[in-house]
Design a protein with these regions (language model features):
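Multi-pass membrane catalytic core of lipid/isoprenoid biosynthesis enzymes
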Residues: 7, 12-57, 103-114, 150-163
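Hydrophobic alpha-helical membrane segments of integral membrane proteins
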Residues: 52-59, 73-83, 104
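Short, function-defining helix-loop hinge/capping sites that tune catalysis or transport
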Residues: 10-14, 35, 72, 86, ...
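Acidic (Asp/Glu-rich) catalytic motifs at the cytosolic membrane interface
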Residues: 1-22, 71, 77, 118-126
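Alpha-helical hydrophobic packing sites
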Residues: 5-8, 29, 80, 91
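Hydrophobic, membrane-inserted alpha-helices
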Residues: 35-43, 60-65, 85-89
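C-terminal membrane-associated helical module and adjoining short loops/tails
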Residues: 69, 80, 87-173
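Membrane-embedded alpha-helical segments that form the functional core of polytopic membrane enzymes
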Residues: 1-5, 51-67
């Protein structure tokens, strides 16, 4: 659904133009109904696994839609949303396998995924800055945002390492 909402911009992007919707390999008339079926299937599987997995899948789908249609144009909020979506995947994996994610894992993932999401934005900002700022307006960033995003990403990456180090040194774990 996110790729379908970005189809015109993706067609103009040097790397994203090869995505199925943007390249024309998959029609949105086929892909969007199929994604609806997958969402329904995910909810059904979540319901089979129990109320908590069902709620987690539902929250993921709602948050994904919120990101697709609004948050991805908001500075920094988009990065927090991506981080949240990644963390929900970890939680769902734990629920599906019967191994609940520990607070250590969730803290590590929060900082690590935040760093990765920032790296994604830094790449987009730097690429756009090299091309005169083309393509940034739909994301809410400016070419001058790169240094701040980089500092935040590095700090978050260090925090994930700190959480991992504290976990390793903890006598209880």
């Amino acid at each position: 659904v996110n790729d379908a909402s970005d189809i015109d911009a993706d067609r103009r992007h040097h790397r994203k133009r090869s995505r199925p919707f943007a390249s024309g390999a998959l029609s949105p008339l086929v892909g969007l109904p199929f994604s609806a079926l997958l969402a329904i299937g995910g909810l059904a599987l979540g319901a089979v696994l129990g109320p908590l997995p069902f709620v987690a899948v539902a929250v993921y789908l709602v948050m994904n839609a919120f990101y697709t249609f609004w948050l991805k144009t908001k500075q920094i909020a988009d990065v927090f949303a991506l981080t949240g979506l990644y963390i929900i995947r970890v939680v769902l994996g734990g629920l599906a396998t019967g191994f609940l994610a520990s607070s250590w894992l969730l803290a590590f993932c929060g900082f690590f995924f935040f760093s990765l999401a920032l790296a994604k934005r830094v790449t987009e900002v730097d690429t756009a800055a090299a091309g005169g700022g083309v393509g940034l307006s739909r994301r809410g960033y400016r070419p001058t945002d790169g240094p701040v995003l980089k500092m935040m990403g590095v700090a978050s990456g260090f925090m994930s390492c700190l959480v991992l180090a504290l976990y390793i040194q903890n006598d209880v774990t």
